Amino acid sequence: MRVIFLDNRDSFVYNLVDLTAREAGVQVFRNTTPVATLRDALEPTAEERTAGERPLLILSPGPGHPRQAGHMMEILDVALQEKIPTLGICLGFQAMVEACGGVVAPVGATHGRTDRVELTEAGIEEPSFSAIAETPRPGEEATHGYISIARYHSLGTRSLPESLISLAHTHDGIVMAARHRSAPCIGLQFHPESILTPAGPLLLRGLLADLTLSPSISRSSHE
């Protein structure tokens, strides 16, 4: 597996790079890298073509609004059009929302805490999420269970565009994970690389495997 990692200048981005490198070969590019260079890097090698594989794109966390993050929005548009397996994390997730026609806005600053967030029906059907799902504690109500995750963000969304489906959300409706309905693209508002996401390494390993398994997935969608 080969990963093209777009660095959005987050302070802890190499924690995520190191975690990813346990599962795949990783090439890191700053978000100021020309789109043509990124497109070339995302082209399958001869060996990958023979094996029916192609690189996976990771859009890293970072500061600011996704539309101000170098060429991230442009390469994400390419990835969605060409159905390149893509994982967006924090700022990368927000880029997914904006690229699909949604709006990212202030939702209140949450920096450095673990939250238990509720899985949706679509979320519990994702193998990577069901593998780390926690049963409700006494007094909690969650039909499909919870996951414990690390939050470091002030922007987010409570409403997704039609092409995205929620996998997890906070008690007050902030979307914490989503997938594209027809492209192999998943986004996490939270940080799997943080020690405050206890099952983060397991989740990341599963997502990398799931996204590269079927490059042109098209699954049924839940409302």
What is each stretch, according to the model?
Residues 1-4, 55:
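Extreme N-terminal starter segment of soluble prokaryotic enzymes
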Residues 3-20, 31:
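N-terminal beta1-alpha1 ligand-phosphate binding loop
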Residues 25-35:
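A short beta-strand-loop structural module common to alpha/beta enzyme folds
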Residues 35-53:
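Short amphipathic alpha-helix with an adjacent loop that forms part of the alpha/beta core around
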Residues 53-126, 131:
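Cysteine-nucleophile active-site neighborhood
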Residues 128-129, 189-198:
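Phosphate-binding/catalytic loops
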Residues 128-182:
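Catalytic beta-strand/loop cores that center a nucleophilic Ser/Cys/Thr
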Residues 195-223:
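Acyltransferase
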